Amino acid sequence: VIVRLESSGGMVHAYGLAAAQLARIKEAGLHLTVCIDKVAASGGYMMACVADKILAAPFAVVGSIGVVAQVPNFHDLLEKHDIDVEVFTAGKYKRTVTVFGENTEEDKQKFQQELEETHKLFKDFVRKYRPNLDVEQVATGEHWYGEDAITRNLVDALQTSDSYILEKMTNSELYAIQSRQKPTIAQKLGISQAAQAVVATAIDKLPDALAKLESAKMPMVKK
């Protein structure tokens, strides 16, 4: 099985599930090759590392084994305008850092601890599927291009997916499987297509409208 993978990452639980689904392919006894033509970073690499073989284009972005969270805080702004936000929880750490309330040092430390624990799980996952990889060396959140990624054992070879597939076509029968996103309600009703048609028609008529407007301009005379 060959999987073309392109992802810069996202939520941990979503990519953990996606990686588990790829692992099922291997559990079924099938050889899994992941091809990275553009990017497989963070959660994307979490998915890629499951493969028996990882191929990357020379300038594909690979790595970013780390965890990041950004939380804006409006407490000072709200306090300036005499606005209080009440947060009610059951359980000491049900809510650590918050957007509207005041974040204490204990809250921040707990949140940082959770990030570190998630990072450890990420590293352990990569280590499980890439035992020859020096995980501590590459689990800094940095990313590398394919040329450098191969020297760090993040990938196994430099090759584009097209090149690899064409190579396999010489002695194998290939079947392309494409997923289709569930259509939205607007697409089902044809609303989105109608809107696109209106926009396209308006764009087509724009040059004529501008020409008429230009010809209708009256010369200006200074008194």
Predicted regions mapped to residue ranges:
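Short glycine/proline-centered loop/turn elements that form peptide/ligand docking sites
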Residues: 61
